[in-house]
């Protein structure tokens, strides 16, 4: 049996569409509000946090590496997240209790590549771009 056609079927068509919307994954995620609640950033693109510790995360098979990450406690809500530190040797610019700016890591809230469970990356350390520190354009401010 197909959809209703003809006169006086608008209400039924509208109601059916309204019900069926909720079976669409993207629509449900956008409109339920639970994804926003679960998101540590609370809908924002970036968030500041304090570095708790440096951690090494083992890469998934078939790769073999220890990816350099940091545990960060967000200032806005106190949630703890793991953030990836990009580029070679950039972990040396970060110390415990530093203030870092953290951004998403691509893939809309999913882990990227071979790094399991890491959904964020470090962008700035002590209000200085990590890329500028890496390239030697800027130095870490003395604290």
From Swiss-Prot:
Gene3D superfamilies: Nucleic acid-binding proteins (2.40.50.140). The keyword Endoplasmic reticulum applies. InterPro entries: NA-bd_OB-fold, Ribosomal_uS12, Ribosomal_uS12_euk/arc. GO terms for cellular component: cytosolic small ribosomal subunit; rough endoplasmic reticulum. Residues 1-15 have a biased composition (Basic residues). GO terms for molecular function: structural constituent of ribosome. PROSITE patterns: RIBOSOMAL_S12. It is found in: Cytoplasm, Cytosol; Cytoplasm; Rough endoplasmic reticulum. It comes from the Eukaryota. CDD domains: Ribosomal_S23. GO terms for biological process: cytoplasmic translation. Keywords: Cytoplasm, Endoplasmic reticulum, Ribonucleoprotein, Ribosomal protein. The keyword Ribonucleoprotein applies. Residues 16-27 have a biased composition (Basic and acidic residues). It holds the Pfam family Ribosom_S12_S23. Residues 1-27 are annotated as: Disordered. Component of the 40S small ribosomal subunit. Belongs to the universal ribosomal protein uS12 family. PANTHER family: 30S RIBOSOMAL PROTEIN S12 FAMILY MEMBER (PTHR11652). This is Small ribosomal subunit protein uS12. It comes from Ictalurus punctatus (Channel catfish).
């Amino acid at each position: 049996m197909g959809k209703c056609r003809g006169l006086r079927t608008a209400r039924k068509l509208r109601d059916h569409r309204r019900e069926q919307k909720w079976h669409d994954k993207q629509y449900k995620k956008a409109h339920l509000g639970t994804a926003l609640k679960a998101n540590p950033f609370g809908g924002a693109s970036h968030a500041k946090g304090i570095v708790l510790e440096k951690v090494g995360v083992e890469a998934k098979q078939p790769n073999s590496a220890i990816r350099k990450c940091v545990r960060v406690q967000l200032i806005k809500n106190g949630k703890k997240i793991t953030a990836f530190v990009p580029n070679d040797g950039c972990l040396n610019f970060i110390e415990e209790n530093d203030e870092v700016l953290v951004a998403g890591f691509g893939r809309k809230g999913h882990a990227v590549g071979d790094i399991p469970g890491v959904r964020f990356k470090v962008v700035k350390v002590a209000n200085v771009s990590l890329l500028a520190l890496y390239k030697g354009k800027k130095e870490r401010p003395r604290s």
